[in-house]
């Protein structure tokens, strides 16, 4: 057991030696006035002790009698007032690492995180995903299914560095969790299955990391599996991701004879004995059969890194190789600037390769001071740019990136602190809404467990309790120095189902549950369809909505009936159309009059909706134009064909006229609605449907059946590929409407031996016969 591996003994010199999991640590002797460290974890200046007073627990703060007298102007906390005494750092900001672990589903993210927590002393036993005991997979649904559903945060320490880790899901239905984690992280570990190589969701998370400019290192995992091939995976990183890999390790053996790795920086072999759960390893000479290969990859590494320093380059050309410290400095520089991506390898499940991975996080990924400062805007004037540097003395600025409901604490708001500091009991400004919020408690999270802290400093990832109006993507700032940071983009749902409680008594409980779940997950929407008298929930896939319904049952005690899944279609136009519409009403008293000419233009896919005013000479007074805008925007949620949202359309207000007495904002709003109905019908309306990229991995003997089935689902086969073990890979595009219950069909067709992944590729035009069916259904409902 891991707990048995802790031994404290006295050496001959009289000093204490702490042996944790096979590695010796010499604790720092502190004066008695300091709190002792536990298992090498440094104390945090902001941590509250168990003996905290009740007022401290509730989030208030006491100011000693010896302090200067309070100003009588305001007796409310500022962002900094209560934080000053607690603002001393236990770990310098340059030694912080805020990282995420991202990959395709089943690449080993959570398993790797569990090993990291064990070897750093954060956990004292290893949790396993397949046993449902992984610390980071704390939800019941995660433990039952063996997958990560929600991103989980924790903090640990390695080599005097503080590492804040977010473990993210790999399933495409939960890609939002990856998106918002990457938005607030400084670096990432991208895992790859050494057998499967680069998989579809690997490409998705890689693009997300590119979007936010996140430096990353690659870890080729599962080197112990049958068919493991480090070098093929390295080649796929080049061809599939367009990355420039920098190989820092090569494996010693593979599959069941995988023993360790060759460290190309030190030019030593690192070998794990298998004792003490992988905590024990040794540095040895490189095996003879790998010496030539190691020299070859070492030379390739040197050629890449010496380009970053002219002096080192000159010395290298003269035959002088850089020392280890210089190599690490240059690898770090190239990683942070995105010149290349370091690649390491190992087997997290077999406890091999994790400690060098932790060293690489410390050595090569950036601290908060090494990433560009955060740019924001003035809430009063978005044209003014405000820069927030990563410094405790800067005004506080943080981004809320996740909301979580806690049964004991209530709503928790996860915040990345980009500058300044905050304390429990202080006030912050929600800069997006202009509302002040009071922080009840500050909590440092470890999966779903929590620890009260008194202050959060720059670089921290912290949970705030007590916020009522803040949602994901909003900025919290110092009330005296407001700033709005860039918001996050959230994907639109692609699937929906009708849901209703089994008993009328649960109607209110279901509404409460849906509201809380929608606050947590911006990719989940719900609405009430009054015509059909039913509630509709929308999400990113069948699994996503299945989890939502399951959470309603477990967390909110609501038993629900769920209808068949429905696709979220879109409507658009295919040509330019211009319409003149006059709204005129006279029924005694003041009448209504508005006359407008609107041109509707199709836009490129993904452009959304745009409004443009081309009014000249006051044909439509400026005060009435917002009425036209509002009228058109309201109509964009309900198209003319089947009532689906309208996308990729520009509406231009070209001309119009008004009446001095009878015209009003409302009249122009009603005219805009009429112009929309007429204009859309003239502009060649068409329906769009979500097209999914579907990758099927199947034994070769079932390949024909799989292809035939995909073709019958209106699928388009893009390419074929091979995988070890006689497996074939089919890459295709299939409409989402044809993919419901596909997993059951695939299992039956291949005797359970095939698997598939699916992710949104694009929206495309619906065939006319299907469009006619959808339109007729809408007309039947309307009738």
From Swiss-Prot:
The protein's name: Elongation factor G, chloroplastic
Transit peptide, from-to: 1-80
Family matches, as InterPro entries: EF_G_plantC, EFG_II, EFG_III, EFG_III/V, EFG_IV, EFG_V, EFG_V-like, EFTu-like_2
PANTHER family reported in the protein's UniProt record: RIBOSOME-RELEASING FACTOR 2, MITOCHONDRIAL, TRANSLATION ELONGATION FACTOR G-RELATED
Family statement: Belongs to the TRAFAC class translation factor GTPase superfamily. Classic translation factor GTPase family. EF-G/EF-2 subfamily.
Keywords: Chloroplast, Elongation factor, GTP-binding, Nucleotide-binding, Plastid, Protein biosynthesis, Transit peptide
GO molecular function: ATP binding; GTP binding; GTPase activity; mRNA binding; translation elongation factor activity
Binding site for GTP: 103-110, 167-171, 221-224
GO biological process: chloroplast organization; post-embryonic development; seed germination
Tissue: Expressed in cotyledons and at lower levels in adult leaves.
Cleaved signal peptide residues: none
Function of the molecule: Chloroplast-localized elongation factor EF-G involved in protein synthesis in plastids. Catalyzes the GTP-dependent ribosomal translocation step during translation elongation. During this step, the ribosome changes from the pre-translocational (PRE) to the post-translocational (POST) state as the newly formed A-site-bound peptidyl-tRNA and P-site-bound deacylated tRNA move to the P and E sites, respectively. Catalyzes the coordinated movement of the two tRNA molecules, the mRNA and conformational changes in the ribosome.
PROSITE patterns (UniProt xref): G_TR_1, G_TR_2
tr-type G domain: residues covered: 94-369
Keyword match Transferase: no
Disruption outcome: Embryo lethality.
Keyword Transmembrane helix: no
Pathway(s) served: Protein biosynthesis; polypeptide chain elongation
Compartments where found: Plastid, Chloroplast
One GO CC term, this protein: apoplast
Species per Swiss-Prot/TrEMBL record: Arabidopsis thaliana (Mouse-ear cress)
């Amino acid at each position: 057991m891991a707990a048995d591996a802790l031994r404290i003994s006295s050496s001959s010199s009289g000093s204490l030696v702490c042996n944790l999991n096979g590695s010796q640590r010499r604790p720092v002797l502190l004066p008695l006035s300091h709190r002792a460290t536990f298992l090498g974890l440094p104390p945090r200046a902001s941590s509250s002790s168990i003996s905290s007073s009740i007022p401290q627990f509730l989030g208030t703060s006491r100011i000693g009698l010896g302090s200067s007298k309070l100003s009588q102007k305001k007796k409310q906390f500022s962002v900094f007032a209560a934080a000053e005494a607690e603002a001393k750092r236990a770990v310098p900001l340059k030694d912080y690492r805020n990282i995420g672990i991202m990959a395709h589903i089943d690449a080993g993210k959570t398993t790797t995180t569990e090993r990291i927590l064990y070897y750093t002393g954060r956990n004292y036993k290893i949790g396993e995903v397949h046993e449902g005991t992984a610390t980071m997979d704390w939800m019941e649904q995660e433990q039952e299914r063996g997958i990560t559903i929600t991103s989980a945060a924790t903090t640990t320490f390695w080599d005097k560095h503080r590492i804040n880790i977010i473990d993210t899901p790999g399933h495409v239905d939960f890609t939002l969790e990856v998106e918002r984690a990457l938005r607030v992280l400084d670096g990432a570990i991208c895992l790859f299955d050494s057998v499967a190589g680069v998989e579809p969701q690997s490409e998705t998370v890689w693009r997300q990391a590119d979007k936010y400019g996140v430096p990353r290192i690659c870890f080729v995992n599962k080197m112990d599996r049958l068919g493991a091939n480090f070098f093929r995976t390295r080649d796929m990183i080049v061809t599939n991701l367009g990355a420039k890999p920098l190989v820092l390790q090569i494996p010693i053996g593979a599959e069941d004879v995988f023993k360790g790795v060759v460290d190309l920086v030190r030019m030593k072999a690192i070998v794990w004995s298998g004792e003490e759960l992988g905590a024990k390893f040794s540095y040895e000479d490189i095996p003879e059969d790998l010496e030539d290969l190691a020299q070859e990859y070492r030379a390739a590494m040197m050629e890449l890194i010496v380009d970053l320093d002219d002096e080192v380059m000159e010395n290298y050309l003269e035959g002088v190789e850089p020392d280890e410290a210089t190599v690490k400095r240059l690898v770090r520089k190239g990683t942070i600037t995105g010149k290349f991506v370091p690649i390491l390898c190992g087997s997290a499940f077999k406890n091999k390769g994790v400690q060098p991975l932790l060293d690489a996080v410390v050595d090569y990924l950036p601290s908060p001071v090494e990433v560009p400062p955060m740019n924001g805007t003035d809430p009063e004037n978005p044209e003014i740019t405000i820069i927030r540097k990563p410094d405790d003395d800067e005004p506080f600025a943080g981004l809320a990136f996740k909301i979580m409901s806690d049964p004991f604490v209530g709503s928790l708001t996860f915040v990345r602190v980009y500058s300044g500091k905050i304390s429990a009991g202080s006030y912050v400004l929600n800069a997006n809404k202009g509302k002040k919020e009071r922080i009840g408690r500050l909590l440092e999270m470890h999966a779903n467990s929590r620890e009260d802290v008194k202050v959060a400093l720059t670089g921290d990832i912290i949970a705030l309790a007590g916020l009522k109006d803040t949602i994901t993507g909003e900025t919290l700032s110092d009330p005296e120095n407001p700033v709005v940071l860039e918001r996050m983009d959230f994907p639109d749902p692609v699937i929906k189902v009708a849901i209703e409680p089994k008993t009328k008594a649960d109607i209110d409980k279901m509404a409460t549950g849906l509201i809380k779940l929608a606050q947590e997950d911006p990719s989940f929407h719900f609405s009430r369809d009054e015509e059909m008298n039913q509630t509709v929930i929308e999400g990113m896939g069948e699994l996503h909505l299945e989890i939502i319904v399951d959470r309603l049952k477990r967390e909110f005690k609501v038993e629900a009936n769920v209808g068949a899944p429905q696709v979220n279609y879109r409507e658009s136009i295919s040509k330019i159309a211009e319409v003149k519409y006059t709204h005129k009403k006279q029924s005694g008293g003041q009448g209504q009059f508005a006359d407008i000419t609107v041109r509707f233009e199709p836009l490129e896919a993904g452009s959304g909706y745009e409004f443009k005013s081309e009014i000249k000479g006051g044909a439509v007074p400026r005060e009435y134009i917002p009425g036209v805008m509002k009228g058109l925007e309201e109509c964009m949620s309900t198209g003319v064909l089947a009532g689906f949202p309208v996308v990729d359309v520009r509406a231009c207000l070209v001309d119009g006229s008004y009446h001095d007495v009878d015209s009003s904002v409302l009249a122009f709003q009603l005219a805009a609605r009429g112009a929309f109905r007429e204009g859309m019908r003239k502009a060649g309306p068409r329906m769009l449907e979500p097209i999914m990229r579907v990758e099927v991995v199947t034994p070769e003997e079932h390949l024909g059946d799989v292809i035939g089935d995909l073709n019958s689902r209106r699928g388009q086969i893009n390419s074929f590929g091979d995988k070890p073990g006689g497996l074939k890979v089919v890459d295709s595009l299939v409409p989402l409407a044809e993919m419901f219950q596909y997993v059951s069909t695939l299992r039956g067709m291949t005797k359970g031996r095939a698997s598939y992944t699916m992710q949104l590729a694009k929206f495309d035009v619906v065939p006319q016969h299907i469009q006619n069916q959808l339109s007729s259904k809408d007309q039947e409902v309307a009738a």
